[in-house]
Structure formats: C-alpha cells, structure tokens
Curated annotation (Swiss-Prot):
GO terms of molecular function: proton-transporting ATP synthase activity, rotational mechanism
Gene3D superfamilies: N-terminal domain of the delta subunit of the F1F0-ATP synthase (1.10.520.20)
Organism: Zymomonas mobilis subsp. mobilis (strain ATCC 31821 / ZM4 / CP4)
Gene designation per UniProt: atpH
Protein name: ATP synthase subunit delta
Subcellular location: Cell inner membrane
Quaternary data: F-type ATPases have 2 components, F(1) - the catalytic core - and F(0) - the membrane proton channel. F(1) has five subunits: alpha(3), beta(3), gamma(1), delta(1), epsilon(1). F(0) has three main subunits: a(1), b(2) and c(10-14). The alpha and beta chains form an alternating ring which encloses part of the gamma chain. F(1) is attached to F(0) by a central stalk formed by the gamma and epsilon chains, while a peripheral stalk is formed by the delta and b chains.
Secretion signal span: none
GO CC, alphabetical: plasma membrane; proton-transporting ATP synthase complex
Primary location recorded for the protein, binned into one broad class: membrane
Family designation: Belongs to the ATPase delta chain family.
The organism's taxonomic lineage, starting at the top: Bacteria, Pseudomonadati, Pseudomonadota, Alphaproteobacteria, Sphingomonadales
UniProt KW keywords: ATP synthesis, Cell inner membrane, Cell membrane, CF(1), Hydrogen ion transport, Ion transport, Membrane, Transport
Source domain of life: Bacteria
C-alpha cells in the first residue's frame, strides 16, 4: 500500500497511521473504521463534545471520563476506545476529525478506492449517500467512499472534494458569486 506523504506528515496523519497499522495487525480495520465513523458523527453533531475536546479549561482526566462514558453508548470497539483515551490523555482529541479523515484515506488506499469529502448543511440520509456514491462511482469508474460532514454555514447544497478537485454547489457559494456579480 502506498501511503500519501502529505497525510503521513500531518499530526492527524501520524496518529491515523499508527491506529491503522495496529488495526491492520489485529485484523480490525473495518471494526475500527466503523467505530471512528460513529465517534466522528457524534463529534460533528454534539457541539458540547467539540468544545470539550478543544477546551483547555477541562482537565485531561475530565475529558477521559467523558470519552469513557461515550464509548458504551456509541458501541465503540476496544481498540478505538483505547485510541480515543490516548488522544484525550495527550490533549489531542481536538484533532479527531483530521485523524478520522486520514484513517479513512488509509483504508481507501488499501482498497484502491477514491475518497470523496462531502460537506452539506444537513446530514445526508442513507439513501442520499447511496445515490451520491453510485453517481460518483459511475463518473470516476472506481469504488468511492463518502466522508460526509455537516457545515450549516454553507446554507444548502453540497461541496464535494475528490483529491485536489472541488465541486462547490453550496448556496453560500452561489450567493457569494451573485453578490460579486452585483458589485460589478
């Protein structure tokens, strides 16, 4: 498997690579990916969790306790739970989204898949994800893994990033272009 140097060079990439290698060694790549997905979704949706992860007011022990409480609720596997505790203990939980994204990229590289980062104003339904995956697969002529994130600031529509390519169909972008056109 060829690992992208730019991913590996980042802090999140190094943590993701370490987790990926252990998961691969233990035959738990998919289990860890599923658990990271659950935590990533919780991280994206729970403002309090993001604040806790990025806040220097709470001690690392408090963050570790919060993670320990979330693990059974989200049904996170043991390896991922230990990894999340490590991030909390090292004060690196704020880097989780980058780590999860890099891990997904390692999995995609292993499987010769393409990863599409999709940003929407509201969470995509399973049906919408399936439709988008099928259309991207048809266009790219390769298996595609969707990395969906929610950013209400785009107002509507979606932004799709595939490697260095980006398709911005967000309402925010369209309003910005309209405002620029009106300015002359």
């Amino acid at each position: 498997m060829e690992i992208s140097g730019s991913i590996q060079a980042s802090l999140g990439g190094r943590y993701a690579l370490a987790l990926f290698e252990v998961a691969q060694e233990k035959g738990q790549i998919d289990t860890v990916a599923a658990s990271l997905g659950k935590f990533d979704e919780a991280f994206a949706q729970a403002r309090e969790l993001r604040l806790l992860a990025n806040n220097q007011i709470f001690s690392r022990k408090h963050v570790e306790k919060a993670i320990a409480a979330l693990v059974p609720v989200l049904a996170i596997d043991d390896l991922t739970a230990k990894f999340l505790n490590l991030l909390a203990a090292k004060g690196r939980l704020g880097a989780f989204p980058e780590i999860a994204s890099a891990y997904r990229q390692y999995v995609a590289d292993l499987r010769s898949e393409k990863v599409a980062d999709v940003i929407t104003a509201h969470p995509l339904s399973d049906e919408q994800k399936s439709t988008l995956t099928a259309r991207l697969k048809e266009q790219l002529k390769a298996d595609v893994q969707i990395n969906a994130t929610v950013d209400p600031s785009i107002l509507g529509g979606m932004i799709v990033r595939l490697g260095s390519r980006q398709i911005d169909g967000s309402i925010r972008s369209k309003l910005h272009m309209l405002a620029q056109a009106m300015k002359g």
